[in-house]
Amino acid sequence: YNKVKDSGYSCCILKGQGNAVMYPNPLIRIPGDVDVWVNAVRDEIRSLAHSLAENANGHVDDESFNHVGLTVNGITVELHTTPGFMANFVYNRRLQRWLKLNVDEQCSNMVALPNDAGLVAVPTHSFNVVYQLYHLYHHYFYEGVGLRQVVDYYFVVTMLNVECEMLSSLQSELKHLGLWKFAGAMMYVLHKVMGLTEDKMIAPMNAKRGQMLLDDILNGGNFGHYDKHHVLGHNLLRLYRDARLLRYYPAEALSEPIFRVWHFLWRVLNKKFS
């Protein structure tokens, strides 16, 4: 975080390390890689990744539509040009617009790390309640949702003081971004797994979608490692997942195969001209 800041870019730490500060004991949460949202254009982030890797005897790993990956001191880091994307082009356009409107506030929301490790910028609770719901939705389609992510989102929701006017605005935002149906499923999961009470919920529970989501979480886990269909291979597993989710989330399920082709072409062209 400090090295990115010292390079002249505003940024914030997404998910993992930022979520840990919400836990009663932040040290009990085991983080994965480090996700950094950098307020800069792609070429600047690409140059930054190479600079950070060279200065730490690391290496740049990969580049996708929303991040440049690198390894420094044995730690996997993703520098995000944008913290997310959706397969449906209409909802993705809305999501990108929403993210751009919120980036400055997130990069200036400073919190103290445990054990006097310093200050870092992390997203606000009001941002996270939408963004991390999106992130769960993305994992549901592409990789699988793990219980750690469910626990994270429980703390995000319970930390939010939702007033009637704010709740109405939040629900409108979720509908605008195509996350409303999934929000109902997630509230059901949080109620069943974590005992979330209805007065804390950001949407009405949907038992049918929620039970399907919970079954997938218990059977597959994060990144779908325990899914019995994992033997199908990455692409066939995605098609299988799209087919299952088509009934409940048609906009994203129908768009995902098209987006996958677009993303493949984007990678080819971007690699050619980068």
Question: What residue spans do the PLM features occupy?
Answer:
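Conserved NTP-donor binding/palm subdomain of two-metal-ion nucleotidyltransferases/polymerases, i.e.
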Residues: 1-32, 38-274
